[in-house]
């Protein structure tokens, strides 16, 4: 079975013995994840903006329809 305590001790020893190698490895592992996170955040922001624009357009259209119906009645 996987021993978490032994693994954690190994990581701490590695970081203590070779801090620059450890930090380089951590940065190399995390950089792609940060890039993916940034890309997905940007994509989500664009989707939210598009949805808000569409909702605003629909709301404006509905308001104009109501105004036109009121004007017809008068």
Curated annotation (Swiss-Prot):
Domain of life per record: Eukaryota
Coiled coil, from the record: 48-74
Membrane topology: Single-pass membrane protein
Transmembrane segments: 20-40
Compartments reported by the entry: Membrane
InterPro entries: Smim15
Key words of the record: Coiled coil, Membrane, Transmembrane, Transmembrane helix
GO CC, alphabetical: membrane
Chain intervals with Basic residues compositional bias: 56-74
Annotated stretches, region: Disordered: 53-74
Membership in a protein family: Belongs to the SMIM15 family.
Protein name as annotated: Small integral membrane protein 15
Gene source species: Gallus gallus (Chicken)
């Amino acid at each position: 079975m996987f021993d978490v305590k032994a693994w954690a001790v190994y990581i701490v020893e590695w970081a203590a013995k070779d801090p620059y190698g450890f930090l380089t490895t951590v940065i190399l592992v995390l950089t792609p994840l940060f890039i993916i996170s940034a890309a997905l955040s940007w994509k989500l922001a664009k989707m939210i903006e598009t949805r808000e624009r569409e909702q605003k357009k629909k709301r404006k259209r509905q308001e104009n329809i109501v105004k036109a119906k009121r004007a017809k009645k008068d």
